[in-house]
A protein has these predicted regions:
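Charged, amphipathic alpha-helical regulatory modules used
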Residues: 1-107
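Conserved catalytic cores of very large enzyme subunits
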Residues: 90-94, 100-461
Length: 461
C-alpha cells in the first residue's frame, strides 16, 4: 500500500475514505443527490487516475486533489468539480491565514523574556527597545516575504529547512560597496527635503561624512557597507593641509569611534568594511588627487608618505581599542597584498601583523601570482568579494554600475539535511540541483522586488 505526503512534508497512510469524504462534501455543498456507491466508484477512479504519479510508493496530497478535480470533470460532474475547487481554495486560504497569523503577545513576550532563539541570533544586536522594535517589524516583514512575494515552493523550502533565506526581516538588498571617490566629489545630499553638504575640504570633515554616509546607507541595506581604497583617497587630505601624524590620527580615530556607535536599526553599529591598498593602485597612481571636490596639482601616487600615516594611525587605533581596551568591531579591514608589498621590517608592517595576531581583525586579499589586480575586486563584507571583471560584462543594471556594486541576497542550502535524505550520490546531486534552482529563483524574485521598490523611492539615498 502506498503512502501520502502532506503539505508539511509528513508521511501518512493512504486512506481512500478521505477521498470519498471530500467528494461527498462537494456534492453536499450543491445539495446534489447521490448514492454512496457513486461516491465509492468516483474515489476508486481517483486512485486509478493518480497511480502513474506515485513515486517510490508515495503520492503527494496535491496530486491526489488534482486527480479528484479531473475525475469529477470527466465523469460529468463539472458543477461538483467546480464546488470542489472552490472548497480547496477556501481551505488553502485558511491554511495561509493560519501560517501568517502573528500573535502580538507571543511576539513581544518572546523577545522581552528572551524565549526566542532569534533574540540572540545576531551578536551585533543589543537586547534593547531598539532590538524589540526590530524583532517585531522583522517578524511582520518575514511573513510578508514568505506569504506575499515568494512562490509556494520557495517559501516551503525555507519553512521546511531545505534552504535558509537570510535577512527575511528586511525588505532590502544584502550588502553594497560604495565609491569613496564619488563621496569626496559630491558629498552627502540629493534627497529632496533633506540637508545637503558640500564636498569635504579637510580630513576631519571627510571622516565625519563617511560615518554619516555609512550610517545612512546601512538603514537601507541588510548587510555590510564598504569603502574601497580607504588609505589612497584619504592621503591627499593629509597632504593638502600638511597635517601632522597626531592630527591625522585624531581624525581617523573619530571615524573609527563613529562607525562603532549604534546608529542603525536594532541599536546596532553599521556593519562596515574598508579595503586598504597599502600601496597606491596602478589605476589611481597618475590620477589627480581630489580634495574639496576639486582636482589638486598632485596625484594619488604622490601621497605615499601620507598613505603610510593614514595606515599607521588606523592600525594603532585598532590595536589600542576603546577606553576599556576592548577591540573595535568595525570597520573590518581588508588589505591587498601585491607584488609591490614591502615585506621588510618597517614600522607599519610590524603594526599590521601585531594587529593581526592580537585580534585576527583584518582580511588579506592575495594578488601575488594572480591574474587579478586590486582594482578588479571589491570586498563587500566578511564573506563576499565581487570580481568587477565579471560585472563589466553585464550591460547596465542597478548592481552592475562600476565601483558601486553589491549583493542582492544570500541563500544557504542545508547540505547535511540534504545528504541525510539522499538515497545515494546520484539522488544527492539530483536534490541539490533542484534546491539550487529554487535558491536562484528566490534571488531573482528578490532582485525584481528590490529594483521595483528602488524605482518607487523606498531607498531615497
Amino acid at each position: 500500500m502506498y503512502e501520502v505526503q502532506k503539505r508539511d512534508g509528513k508521511i501518512a497512510e493512504f486512506d481512500i475514505a478521505k477521498i470519498s469524504s471530500a467528494i461527498s462534501k462537494a456534492f453536499d455543498a450543491l445539495e446534489k443527490q447521490y448514492h454512496p456507491s457513486t461516491i465509492d466508484l468516483l474515489a476508486l477512479n481517483v486512485t486509478a487516475h493518480f497511480e502513474p504519479r506515485i513515486k517510490n510508493g508515495i503520492i503527494s496530497v496535491e496530486d491526489v486533489q488534482d486527480s479528484v478535480e479531473e475525475v469529477l470533470s470527466t465523469a460529468g460532474y463539472a458543477d461538483v468539480a467546480k464546488s470542489y475547487i472552490l472548497y480547496r481554495k477556501q481551505r488553502e486560504k485558511v491554511r495561509n491565514a493560519n501560517a501568517t497569523l502573528l500573535d502580538y503577545k507571543d511576539l513581544v513576550d518572546q523577545y522581552v523574556k528572551v524565549e526566542d532563539w532569534r533574540v540572540k541570533e545576531n551578536s551585533t544586536v543589543t537586547y534593547s527597545v531598539g532590538g524589540l522594535i526590530l524583532s517585531n517589524s522583522g517578524a511582520i516583514t518575514a511573513n510578508y516575504w514568505l506569504s506575499e512575494i515568494y512562490d509556494d515552493e520557495v517559501a516551503k523550502a525555507h519553512r521546511n529547512a531545505d534552504i535558509h533565506l537570510h535577512d527575511l526581516s528586511m525588505l532590502t538588498g544584502y550588502c553594497a560597496g560604495w565609491s569613496l571617490k564619488q563621496l569626496i566629489q559630491e558629498c552627502l545630499g540629493g534627497v529632496p527635503g533633506k540637508i545637503t553638504s558640500k564636498p569635504a575640504s579637510h580630513l576631519s570633515s571627510l571622516c565625519n561624512q563617511m560615518v554619516n554616509f555609512l550610517g545612512i546607507m546601512q538603514n537601507e541595506w541588510a548587510g555590510a557597507q564598504a569603502f574601497s581604497s580607504f588609505d589612497t583617497y584619504l592621503a591627499p587630505f593629509v597632504k593638502a593641509d600638511n597635517l601632522t601624524y597626531e592630527e591625522t590620527k585624531q581624525c581617523v580615530e573619530s571615524f573609527v569611534f563613529g562607525v562603532n556607535t549604534p546608529s542603525r536599526w536594532g541599536t546596532q553599529a553599521p556593519f562596515s568594511n574598508i579595503t586598504l591598498d597599502w600601496v597606491c593602485p596602478a589605476d589611481l597612481r597618475d590620477q589627480p588627487a581630489i580634495v574639496g571636490g576639486k582636482e589638486m596639482d598632485f596625484t594619488y601616487g604622490d601621497c605615499k608618505v601620507e598613505m603610510d600615516m593614514v595606515n599607521k594611525a588606523f592600525i594603532e587605533i585598532m590595536i589600542e581599542g576603546d577606553a576599556n581596551g576592548r577591540g573595535f568591531q568595525y570597520p573590518i579591514p581588508t588589505y591587498s597584498i601585491t607584488r609591490d608589498f614591502d615585506w621588510s621590517e618597517t614600522e607599519n608592517n610590524r603594526l599590521l601583523f601585531e594587529m593581526t595576531s592580537k585580534y585576527g581583525t583584518p582580511y588579506f586579499s592575495n594578488y601575488i601570482n594572480s591574474d587579478m589586480e586590486p582594482s578588479d575586486v571589491r570586498s563587500m563584507c566578511c564573506r563576499l568579494r565581487l570580481d568587477l571583471r565579471e560585472l563589466r560584462k553585464k550591460s547596465g543594471g542597478f548592481f552592475g554600475s562600476g565601483e558601486s556594486t553589491g549583493s542582492i541576497g544570500v541563500v544557504t542550502i542545508n547540505m547535511p539535511r540534504l545528504a541525510y535524505l539522499s538515497a545515494d550520490e546520484a539522488d544527492f546531486y539530483r536534490r541539490l540541483d533542484h534546491l539550487m534552482d529554487v535558491s536562484a529563483r528566490s534571488l531573482h524574485t528578490k532582485r525584481e522586488v528590490v529594483t521595483r521598490l528602488l524605482d518607487a523611492g523606498l531607498y531615497p539615498y
